[in-house]
Amino acid sequence: MSVAEFASLIALLTSLVALSIDAMLPALPQIAADLAVSDPNDAQLVIGLFLLGNAFGQLLFGPLSDTYGRKPVIVAGLSLFLIGCFVSVIAESFSVLLLGRVLQGVGASGPRTVSMSMVRDLYSGRSMARIMSISMSIFMLVPILAPALGQAIMLLVGWRYIFGTFIVFGVLGLFWLLLRQPETLADEHRRPMQLATLISGFVTVYRSRAALGYSLAIGTMFGAFIGFLSSVQQIFQDTFAVGKWFPYLFAILALFLGAASLLNSRMVMHFGMKKIVRLAMACSPVVSLVYLVICLSVDDSGLIGFMVWGALCFFGVGLCIGNINALAMEPLGQIAGLGAAVVGFFSSFVAILVGIPLGRAYDGTQLPLIAGFAILGVIGLCLVYWAGRDTTQETEK
């Protein structure tokens, strides 16, 4: 398999998470109405519980992939994801729909986590960051197109058929993996799955300043992102009264994320991961603090101001994400599968812990979201500098 095809497969497998989130965003108000959800903010649980299942699923699939190999575990995850989609399709109550979303989240964590391990099996250092960045560039087509796709499906045949789209992509990834991708973990490198092994993985990450610091920094960054994803549809619809334009406005923001990720794939080979991460992580708090002051100084900063702020924050995330994941994984080459699981759990747990309350803090204005970005951005930047002082981390390649 060529590098381009491998990066494309990784992008598809990891994009199931983004697809399962972004395509649902336009449908949240309709789901709340059809399933008699009393509090509109409760509809955000369609996103939050998916991410919760995704976080805990990583602890299962990562160690399993170190024992049984990468391919069988990804197949198991995709199968569970498809089951969750079928549950959501037939759901007649909000609680059953949420059950399906949890199953989807757990299942999607398999390809997401183990795909990172496959990359780590074959690449390291800046080469690994480059593969991740190329994958992210392809992956970014999902948030650009998914909201428009979800809205079109909802308007044409109803929101339940959005899950049918998830099934199509899941089946495509399943057969592509089975037919084209060789196993990347040799038999002699596999280890039996034991509770002590899982605990040792947590201890290894905890003792590594780089792995722990970058994992927590990812959590703060994605926590802000979860808050954004959870409340952005309400902001566009209720605050700015442009709900029907939501997919297209969101696509504009996603373009900045994708462009930054593509730019990073070229920059990282020249400037290194740490420099880019530090610069990118500084973007969110600086821009957010400036925009927060503007919003507090004038009665209405307008949609354009919100879009400029969002575009700059998305651009910073695009520059950062491939590099910071690679930096978190760099000290964990000997436990790639377990390491990816623990890093993913740490970052996802932190993200959910701060992201869901941030989304539910929506009060009819964009102010809680902007303040959350500023605070989490400062914390994330401090963590990045702290992690970068780990003298035991491997030199970037």
PLM regions with names:
Residues 100-141:
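Cytoplasmic helix-loop-helix junction between adjacent transmembrane helices
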Residues 5-37, 228-233:
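Extracytoplasmic
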Residues 55-95:
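Conserved MFS/SLC helix-loop-helix module at the cytosolic interface between two early adjacent transmembrane helices
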Residues 37, 69, 90-96, 107, ...:
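Helix-breaking motifs and short loop linkers at transmembrane-helix boundaries and internal kinks
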Residues 80-87, 95-103, 304-310:
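Paired small-residue
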Residues 28-56:
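Extracellular/periplasmic helix-loop-helix junction of adjacent transmembrane segments
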Residues 184-214:
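Juxtamembrane intracellular "pre-TM" segments in multi-pass secondary transporters
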Residues 96, 126, 130-179, 185:
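Helix-loop-helix hairpin linking two adjacent transmembrane segments in secondary transporters
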